[in-house]
């Protein structure tokens, strides 16, 4: 996408109903790399807001995306209010344009949206302590629980087949057959690793097709930094970054949180001896998640959470290796073999999960007959 110019930014800032004139200094805000995010505030400094240009290279249907977000946030607001909470703080609140729309289209055809800024909160970039990880788990579980009665099938698929692991496997095989850069000969162990787990790729979608686990509203990007915590108390406040809210499985959200949080290494750690799956952190997260989401989950769905941890990690590794084979076009790289290092880290975590998989299953579903 083209860089945001000052006139485009000012026009966008003036298009929304912020309750008065606003100021924006033009600097990008936050850690995100997909959308262009800016902090704006009323000229009298009484209130702050988030203004974003939606990346339509990634999200090709911004209208459907905003329909998803508006529907889900309205539902969450009603639930929070009924529970005696504060929907102005515990849920993202979409600011309408001056004409009452949920988004604004600028002169270049780009889509913009705005939210209330949730004051006095922080988002963590990594797991600092067990208590924080449990709080994130409880907040994500509550998010799932509050959306348990939302009609998931009515949501738009904002990124097609995002967690379709069999399709990710098929894309890997296509990239391997093409071998555009001649890299296949250097990754024989990784190829064998993936192929040995081809059947595993189908487990969750087969369970869904058989009616064993339900289709749900899922976030699909449950990194720890997508949960806001109260700056003073550390209490979980709300879940943010709802662009990938789509129909999915609870195992996806649970699994991606485990993939990113229940280990002691960077995602791109080149030294595999430093990569360790942490079963204790897995248990901490599982107990927190089930304490808020478990009441709406039956045995088979709880059992699927362990599969979610394994398959979201495997799927991510497959995606990294596919990008490596295709020339590193999707994931940004900072060094040669960066995506290969990322893939190897995911595969090391998968191996370690497999070593304790019965324990993982027993933690999320003690009633399971192993």
Describe every region a protein language model picked out.
Residues 1-25:
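Juxta-kinase regulatory segment immediately upstream of eukaryotic protein kinase catalytic domains
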Residues 26-28, 33-174, 248-250, 261, ...:
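Conserved ATP-binding subdomain of kinase catalytic cores across diverse folds
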Residues 27-31, 52-53, 59-63, 118-134, ...:
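ATP-dependent phospho-/nucleotidyl transfer catalytic cores
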Residues 241:
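Conserved active-site aspartate in kinases
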Residues 251-295, 311-330:
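Active-site activation/catalytic loop segments of kinase-like enzymes and analogous catalytic loops
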Residues 302-312:
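Small/polar glycine-rich anion-binding or flexible loop at a beta-alpha turn
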Residues 353-356:
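Long, compositionally biased intrinsically disordered regions
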């Amino acid at each position: 996408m083209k860089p945001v110019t000052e006139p485009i930014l000012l026009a966008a800032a003036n298009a929304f109903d912020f309750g008065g004139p606003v100021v924006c200094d033009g600097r990008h805000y936050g850690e995100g790399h997909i959308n262009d995010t800016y902090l704006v505030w009323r000229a009298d400094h009484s209130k702050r807001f988030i203004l974003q240009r939606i990346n339509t290279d990634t999200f090709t249907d911004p209208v459907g995306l905003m329909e998803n977000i508006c529907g889900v946030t309205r539902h969450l607001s009603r639930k929070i209010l009924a529970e005696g909470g504060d929907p102005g703080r515990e849920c993202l609140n979409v600011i309408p344009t001056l004409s009452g729309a949920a988004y604004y289209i600028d002169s270049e055809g780009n889509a913009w949206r705005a939210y209330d800024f949730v004051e006095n909160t922080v988002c963590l970039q990594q797991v600092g302590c067990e208590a924080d990880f449990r709080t994130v788990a409880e907040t994500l579980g509550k998010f799932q629980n509050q959306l348990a009665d939302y009609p998931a099938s009515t949501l738009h698929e904002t990124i097609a087949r995002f967690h379709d692991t069999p399709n990710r496997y098929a894309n890997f095989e296509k990239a391997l057959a093409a071998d555009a850069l001649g890299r296949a000969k250097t990754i024989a162990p990784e190829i064998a690793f993936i192929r040995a787990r081809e059947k595993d790729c189908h487990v969750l979608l087969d369970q869904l097709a058989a009616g064993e686990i339900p289709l749900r509203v899922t976030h699909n990007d449950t990194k720890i930094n997508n949960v806001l915590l109260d700056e003073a108390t550390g209490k979980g406040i709300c879940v943010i970054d709802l662009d990938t809210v789509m129909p999915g499985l609870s195992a996806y959200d649970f699994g991606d949180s485990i993939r990113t949080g229940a280990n002691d290494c960077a995602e791109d750690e080149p030294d595999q001896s430093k990569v360790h799956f942490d079963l204790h952190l897995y248990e901490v997260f599982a107990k927190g998640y089930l304490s808020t989401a478990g009441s709406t989950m039956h045995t088979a769905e709880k059992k699927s959470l362990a599969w979610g941890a394994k398959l979201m990690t495997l799927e991510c590794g497959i995606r990294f290796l596919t990008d490596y084979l295709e020339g590193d076009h999707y994931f940004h790289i900072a060094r040669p073999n960066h995506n290969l290092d990322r893939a190897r880290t995911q595969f090391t975590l998968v191996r370690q999960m497999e070593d304790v998989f019965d324990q993982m299953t027993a933690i999320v579903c003690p009633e399971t007959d192993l």
